[in-house]
Regions:
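Non-catalytic cap/lid and distal C-terminal segments of serine-dependent acyl enzymes
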Residues: 1-251
Length: 251
């Protein structure tokens, strides 16, 4: 079952479109389901709504793997540079902000965004659906991966699974290194990958650096390098079954 609606983001004083997928028999199955938040949720399910006309194909993947999970896809902010603001945990330097062709400093709303996810959206989902309240995960790519990883590190007792694809770590590399030093995630699960044909060589170098910082901090950690992987929804969609199987099993 697919449910589309708008939800108020009190933490950011705006509204946002979300799409919720729940198993068709959720009212009668007497099951409780894990939940996966999907950033850039407009790309999660439908090609006609996705960037460049290619979705990540989550519905096809969970059906093929026979996974029972609730998916909550949160659309990004489509206003100029607001996606970068919301998915940016810290304010970027002037030089980095200029790379986004901005005459102002970019980022810094990420803390409020993950506060919305954990203290507004999660209780809303838990109240409406039969969830496993202690089994939440999050996924994102590029800057959506940054905010996913930030949520995973800031709220490790709430967000216990995280998949980050082609993370733009070069934007906040040292900030994440510092945050990793003071965060306990040993009992959580992390999937991380990067492609060899990303838009900028800094993707690979920064992901390799963060990988080294992560290693040893948690047992359930998987890092993959795809030599032919590009920075696109098509390539990310090919990797969805990998982290879904890691998190939830399936065929």
């Amino acid at each position: 079952m697919i449910i589309k609606e708008k939800i108020e983001m009190k933490s950011l004083k705006r509204e946002r479109d979300i799409i919720i997928y729940v198993p068709d028999d959720y009212l009668t199955s007497k099951k409780r389901y894990p939940v996966l938040f999907i950033n850039d949720g407009q790309n999660a399910f439908f090609d006609e709504e996705a960037y460049i006309g290619k979705s990540w194909g989550f519905l096809e993947s969970i059906k093929k793997l026979q996974i029972d999970v609730i998916l909550v896809a949160i659309y990004c902010n489509f206003e100029p540079l607001k996606r970068e603001d919301e998915y940016g945990p810290w304010v970027m330097s002037q030089d980095l902000s200029q790379e986004f062709q901005s005459n102002r400093l970019v980022g810094g709303e990420g803390k409020a965004y993950v506060h919305f996810l954990t203290t507004e959206l999660k209780p809303y989902i838990d109240q409406r659906f039969p969830t496993k309240i202690d089994d939440y995960g999050i996924v994102g790519s590029s800057m959506g991966a940054l905010i996913s990883f930030y949520a995973f590190l800031r709220y490790p007792t709430i967000i216990k699974k995280c998949a980050i694809l082609s993370s733009a770590f070069w934007i906040y590399e040292q900030e994440f290194v510092n945050l990793l030093k003071v965060t306990a995630i040993s009992h959580n699960m992390l999937y991380m990958d990067v492609g060899g044909q990303e838009d900028d060589e800094r993707y690979v170098s920064s992901n390799e650096h963060i990988k080294k910082c992560v290693e040893g901090k948690l047992k359930d950690f998987q890092y993959r390098y795809f030599p032919e992987g590009k920075h696109s929804e098509y390539h990310w969609s090919q990797r969805v079954p990998i982290f879904l199987r890691m998190f939830y099993g399936g065929k």
